[in-house]
Amino acid sequence: MRLALLCGLLLAGITATQGGLLNLNKMVTHMTGKKAFFSYWPYGCHCGLGGKGQPKDATDWCCQKHDCCYAHLKIDGCKSLTDNYKYSISQGTIQCSDNGSWCERQLCACDKEVALCLKQNLDSYNKRLRYYWRPRCKGKTPAC
């Protein structure tokens, strides 16, 4: 379902300045130096849309926590893939704008948290977990 939504959004011609998913991509790319879409989507059992099972490493744990953050926002009616927000990065510090809706500010906070987590855990990044086969993700998914 989420993949179909993402494909639909991309086919609809969303530009690089629209939507939370694209903000997330730019924020992670800036903080990690890795092209987020190509390095983290998918990665392990939790990076990318959805996630299940035990996270494979510290990088994957960042994504699992991010999934939980988005899940809480969804309960509150936020649209994590399409809500747009404003932010800036100065000297390696992400500053979410105080402008925008509550959902937009919270979405920025979720994305900021994962971008910083991924940066702090760059040493755990394992290329073998890139395109990890999700059916191999076993065990109980950590609770949010």
Curated annotation (Swiss-Prot):
Residues at the catalytic site: H66, D111
Name under which the protein is recorded: Group IID secretory phospholipase A2
Binding annotation for Ca(2+): H46, G48, G50, D67
Cysteine disulfide links: C45-C137, C47-C63, C62-C117, C68-C144, C69-C110, C78-C103, C96-C108
PROSITE patterns for this protein: PA2_ASP, PA2_HIS
EC number(s) per entry: 3.1.1.4
Record's function text: Secretory calcium-dependent phospholipase A2 that primarily targets extracellular lipids, exerting anti-inflammatory and immunosuppressive functions. Hydrolyzes the ester bond of the fatty acyl group attached at sn-2 position of phospholipids (phospholipase A2 activity) with preference for phosphatidylethanolamines and phosphatidylglycerols over phosphatidylcholines.
Catalytic activity: a 1,2-diacyl-sn-glycero-3-phosphoethanolamine + H2O = a 1-acyl-sn-glycero-3-phosphoethanolamine + a fatty acid + H(+); 1-hexadecanoyl-2-(9Z-octadecenoyl)-sn-glycero-3-phosphoethanolamine + H2O = 1-hexadecanoyl-sn-glycero-3-phosphoethanolamine + (9Z)-octadecenoate + H(+); 1-hexadecanoyl-2-(9Z,12Z-octadecadienoyl)-sn-glycero-3-phosphoethanolamine + H2O = 1-hexadecanoyl-sn-glycero-3-phosphoethanolamine + (9Z,12Z)-octadecadienoate + H(+); 1,2-dihexadecanoyl-sn-glycero-3-phospho-(1'-sn-glycerol) + H2O = 1-hexadecanoyl-sn-glycero-3-phospho-(1'-sn-glycerol) + hexadecanoate + H(+)
Enzyme class label: hydrolase
Record note on cofactor: Binds 1 Ca(2+) ion per subunit.
Source organism (scientific name): Mus musculus (Mouse)
Necessary cofactors: Ca(2+)
Keywords: Calcium, Cell membrane, Cytoplasm, Disulfide bond, Glycoprotein, Hydrolase, Inflammatory response, Lipid metabolism, Membrane, Metal-binding, Phospholipid metabolism, Secreted, Signal
Keyword Manganese recorded: no
Signal peptide coordinates: 1-19
Pfam families named among the record's database cross-references: Phospholip_A2_1 (PF00068)
Tissue specificity comment: Highly expressed in secondary lymphoid tissues, spleen and lymph nodes. Expressed at a lesser extent in thymus. Expressed in CD4-positive, IL2RA/CD25-positive, FOXP3-positive Tregs (at protein level). Expressed in myeloid cell subsets resident in spleen and lymph nodes, ITGAX/CD11C-positive dendritic cells and macrophages (at protein level). Enriched in CD4-positive, ITGAM/CD11B-positive dendritic cell subset. Expressed in pulmonary ITGAX/CD11C-positive dendritic cell subset (at protein level).
Gene3D superfamilies named in the record: Phospholipase A2 domain
Entry's induction text: Up-regulated in thymus upon endotoxin challenge. Up-regulated during Treg differention in response to TGFB1. Up-regulated in pulmonary ITGAX/CD11C-positive dendritic cell subset upon chronic oxidative stress associated with aging.
The keyword Cell membrane is assigned to this record: yes
GO molecular-function terms, A-Z: calcium ion binding; calcium-dependent phospholipase A2 activity; heparan sulfate proteoglycan binding; heparin binding
Biological processes annotated in GO: arachidonate secretion; CD4-positive, CD25-positive, alpha-beta regulatory T cell differentiation; inflammatory response; lipid catabolic process; negative regulation of T cell activation; negative regulation of T cell proliferation; phosphatidylcholine metabolic process; phosphatidylethanolamine metabolic process
Glycosylation sites noted in the Swiss-Prot or TrEMBL record: N99
Phenotype upon gene inactivation: Knockout mice are born at the expected Mendelian rate and have normal embryonic and postnatal development. They are susceptible to acute and chronic inflammatory reactions and resistant to tumorigenesis. In a model of hapten-induced contact hypersensitivity, mutant mice show an enhanced T-helper 1 immune response in skin lymph nodes at sensitization phase followed by delayed inflammation resolution with more severe ear swelling, epidermal hyperplasia, and inflammatory cell infiltration at elicitation phase.
Record GO cellular component, one term: extracellular region
